[in-house]
């Protein structure tokens, strides 16, 4: 059970203008893009940022996520989180990046855990 990386979600009204702003701010460039067309969500990865655009309805609980942890075994993390009292809000679910799980911890913080494909 290991965290392989972390990401901070940035929610934007316009993905392209947000990408321009954050590329200028960080000096980084977008490395990947994903779409969830069934929910009207567009996502861009830029360094340790995940820029997300979509309607409040499409975003659902995702709009409340404060941090994303990339993990080696989502099943192990799910068991650990449940055992320590976290509430599963969504998932495990398949996404373009892999499988994710969204939980609320005991402090009320909403966190996403993702086991990346490949």
Q: How should these model regions be labeled?
A:
Residues 43, 68, 100-102:
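Short hydrophobic/aromatic beta-strand element in the GNAT-like acyltransferase core
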Residues 1-19, 65-67, 117:
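N-terminal beta-strand motif that seeds the catalytic metal site of vicinal oxygen chelate
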């Amino acid at each position: 059970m290991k965290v392989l990386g972390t990401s901070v979600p940035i929610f934007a009204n316009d993905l392209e203008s947000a990408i321009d702003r954050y590329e200028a701010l960080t000096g980084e460039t977008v490395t990947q893009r994903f779409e969830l067309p069934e929910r009207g969500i567009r996502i861009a990865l830029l360094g340790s940022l995940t820029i997300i655009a979509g309607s409040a309805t499409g975003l659902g609980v995702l709009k409340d996520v404060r941090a994303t942890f990339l993990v080696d075994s989502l099943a192990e993390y799910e068991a650990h989180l449940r055992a320590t009292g976290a509430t599963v809000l969504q998932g495990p679910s398949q996404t373009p990046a892999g499988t994710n799980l969204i939980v609320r911890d005991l402090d009320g913080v909403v966190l996403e855990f993702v086991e990346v494909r490949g």
